[in-house]
């Protein structure tokens, strides 16, 4: 019988036939999702022989939702994901004009999905600008709900920004606004709770996956109390809650300035296992690391609240409207995000099967047009690529 996934006493309770919502996505979402779903279902059937099955339930967001309901992110969609805990999604178009700045950010903030998790690894055969891309194997934990992504800012020349500037200058005695008459102002909230729950999740992930080092990435040399606070609170958490693991050497927690980190992931990526970052730094680092191993077209991602069990797994690339509906898009990002979903619900054999199929296809030069051009091989369509994966399952 189809049932919802539940979360009890800090653990997911997964029935044999869980109902999992999906958002097809805009642009190439129509191409990648339908092909990925076929691969998911075949892998589940191969592993469990019909004893387990995902019941996929479509929910609306993005352009499809707007066309059908007049709302880019319907309340019904949020409620369904809240009650079902999990979802997987394709890329979403950002609405033009006022209102929601980003549907992806809105989903993360509405559901308090505080950890953006991106495992970055190299697949043999993927074109990369690096001589040794195989040395890059880093899992990113990016804080998802704070920092400048809170969207607290005021436009230059408005009465609102003038109130803020007057308060800063008159009440707080701030002297460092260089051009107060023409400045926009933004606020960067970073909290103890927000920082520590993210860093705790990163440490727990490292310990669960036999990884030793968790590195705190920050700009505390410039922003002493926000970025510096992230670093400080991370060390305090580690010493308070993981003293035994630190003492035994099972866990090492260190830190690095963000700009140096962006150098070191090119020069010595092997020195990092798991990295925890504030929101903006995490945004930069996620895409920079993805470029080292083939780009965001093959990068999976998940947005997770480890305290409630809620999680959305997603294709990390954009909508690519120039190739939408043409059966050209690489479905690997949503496929590998599906692998993260299956790992999350404890169906790791399904994840392993799909991962090995993707590895084999790429190693054999059976790739979509994004990689085929650089490898000098004939490009497969989205459908052909998924059919190749089916033969490898």
Swiss-Prot record:
Per the record's keyword annotation, is Transcription included, yes or no?
Answer: no
Site feature (Critical for catalysis) residues: 149, 219
What is this enzyme's EC?
1.1.1.42
Q: How is the cofactor bound?
A: Binds 1 Mg(2+) or Mn(2+) ion per subunit.
The residues the record assigns to binding Mg(2+) are 283
Q: Name one GO biological process term.
A: tricarboxylic acid cycle
Residues given in the record as D-threo-isocitrate binding sites: 102, 104, 108, 118, 142
Its recorded reaction(s) are:
D-threo-isocitrate + NADP(+) = 2-oxoglutarate + CO2 + NADPH
Give the UniProt keywords, A-Z: Glyoxylate bypass, Magnesium, Manganese, Metal-binding, NADP, Oxidoreductase, Tricarboxylic acid cycle
Stated role: Catalyzes the oxidative decarboxylation of isocitrate to 2-oxoglutarate and carbon dioxide with the concomitant reduction of NADP(+).
Subunit and partners:
Homodimer.
Q: Specify the protein name.
A: Isocitrate dehydrogenase [NADP]
Name of the gene: icd
């Amino acid at each position: 019988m189809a049932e919802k996934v539940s979360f009890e006493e800090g653990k997911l309770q997964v029935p044999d036939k869980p109902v999992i919502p999906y958002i097809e996505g805009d642009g190439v979402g129509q191409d990648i999702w339908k092909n990925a779903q076929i691969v998911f279902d075949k892998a589940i059937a191969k592993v469990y022989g019909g004893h387990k099955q995902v019941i996929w339930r479509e929910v609306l967001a993005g352009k499809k939702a707007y066309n059908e309901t007049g709302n880019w992110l319907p309340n019904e969609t949020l409620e369904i994901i809240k009650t079902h805990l999990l979802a997987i999604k394709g890329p979403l178009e950002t609405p033009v004009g006022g209102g929601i700045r980003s549907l992806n950010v809105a989903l993360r903030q509405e559901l308090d999905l505080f950890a953006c998790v991106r495992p970055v690894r190299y697949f043999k055969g993927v074109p990369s600008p690096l001589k040794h891309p195989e040395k890059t194997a880093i899992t990113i934990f990016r804080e998802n709900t704070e920092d400048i992504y809170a969207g607290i800012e005021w436009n230059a020349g408005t009465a609102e920004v003038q109130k803020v500037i007057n308060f800063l200058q008159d009440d707080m005695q701030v002297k460092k606004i260089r051009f107060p008459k023409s400045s926009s102002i933004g606020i960067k909230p970073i909290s103890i709770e927000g920082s520590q729950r993210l860093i705790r999740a990163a440490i727990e992930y490292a310990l669960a996956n036999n990884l030793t080092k968790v590195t705190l990435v920050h700009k505390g040399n410039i922003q002493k109390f926000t970025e510096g606070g992230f670093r400080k609170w991370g060390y305090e958490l580690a010493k308070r809650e993981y003293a035994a693991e630190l003492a035994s050497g099972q866990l090492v927690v260190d830190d690095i300035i963000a700009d140096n980190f962006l150098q070191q992931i090119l020069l010595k990526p092997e020195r990092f296992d798991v990295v925890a970052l504030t929101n903006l730094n995490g945004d930069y680092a996620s895409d920079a690391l993805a470029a080292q191993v083939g780009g965001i077209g093959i990068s999976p991602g998940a947005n997770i609240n480890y305290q409630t069990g809620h999680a959305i797994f997603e294709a990390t690339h954009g909508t690519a409207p120039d190739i939408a509906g043409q059966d050209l898009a690489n479905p690997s990002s949503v496929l590998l995000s599906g692998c993260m979903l299956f790992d999350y619900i404890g169906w790791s054999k399904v994840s392993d099967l799909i991962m090995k199929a993707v590895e084999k296809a790429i190693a054999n030069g059976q790739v979509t047009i994004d990689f085929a051009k650089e490898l000098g091989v004939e490009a497969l369509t989205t459908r052909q690529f998924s059919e190749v994966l089916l033969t490898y399952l």
